[in-house]
């Protein structure tokens, strides 16, 4: 089997539970005899930078990272609010990264493409035409519920309203992903 994995942050070094879950999946894939190659693609942010030396050395593994700015801006948040799109997800989508992924899928035959979290799955719809692989969405959290809970516990009415909008847009995105993907794994 040949597998492409896209994550929204590097699994190594292991900084939190999400990193631990992604690292464990990668290690499990590499340990399977049926898996010939794992192409691991990861976004690298200021909060979660890429450290090549932290990844395991394995002849089955190739790693590609993409630096991306995901910092929150008032203008970006406002525009997303007006367009009724998820600002949480929009910050992780980048045209140059999409083109690199499309090129890799076009030039290589993968059996599976695994999207680690909703933030990586923002690329799924744009990548489908480039591969016959089965697409799998691996949910680490029910993201909209986290934001809904934040809204419930917020006193400031404007902030509460904005967090509710974020929760709603994430809920729509999660339902959309679940209805389109060919497989889903939740933790």
Question: Each predicted region: which residue ranges?
Answer:
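A short helix->loop->beta-strand "cap" motif at the edges of active sites that frequently abuts
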Residues: 35, 130-134, 181-182
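N-terminal subdomain of nucleotide-sugar transferases
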Residues: 1-64, 106-108
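Acceptor-binding helix/loop patch of EC 2.4 sugar-transfer enzymes
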Residues: 75-87, 136-172
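Short, well-ordered alpha-helical microsegments
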Residues: 47-50, 120-124
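A conserved catalytic-core segment of Leloir-type glycosyltransferases
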Residues: 40-104
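A short beta-strand/loop micro-motif in the catalytic core of glycosyltransferases
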Residues: 113-114, 174-187
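Short N-terminal targeting/anchoring amphipathic segment
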Residues: 101-121, 134-136
């Amino acid at each position: 089997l040949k597998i492409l994995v896209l994550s929204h942050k590097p699994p190594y070094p292991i900084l939190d539970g999400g990193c631990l879950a992604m690292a464990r999946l990668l290690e499990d894939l590499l340990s399977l005899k049926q898996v010939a190659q794992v192409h691991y693609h990861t976004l690298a942010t200021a909060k979660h930078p890429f450290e090549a030396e932290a990844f395991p050395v394995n002849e089955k593994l190739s790693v590609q990272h993409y630096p991306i700015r995901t910092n929150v801006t008032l203008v970006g948040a406002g525009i997303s609010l007006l367009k009724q799109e998820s600002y949480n997800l929009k910050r992780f989508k980048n045209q140059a990264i999409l083109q690199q992924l499309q090129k890799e899928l076009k030039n290589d035959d993968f059996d599976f493409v695994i999207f680690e979290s909703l933030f990586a799955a923002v690329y799924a719809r744009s990548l489908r035409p480039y591969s016959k692989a089965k697409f799998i969405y691996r949910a680490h959290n029910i993201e909209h519920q986290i934001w809904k809970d934040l809204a419930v516990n917020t006193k400031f009415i404007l902030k509460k309203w904005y967090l509710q909008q974020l929760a709603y847009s994430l809920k729509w995105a999660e339902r959309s992903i679940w209805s389109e993907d060919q497989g889903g794994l939740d933790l």
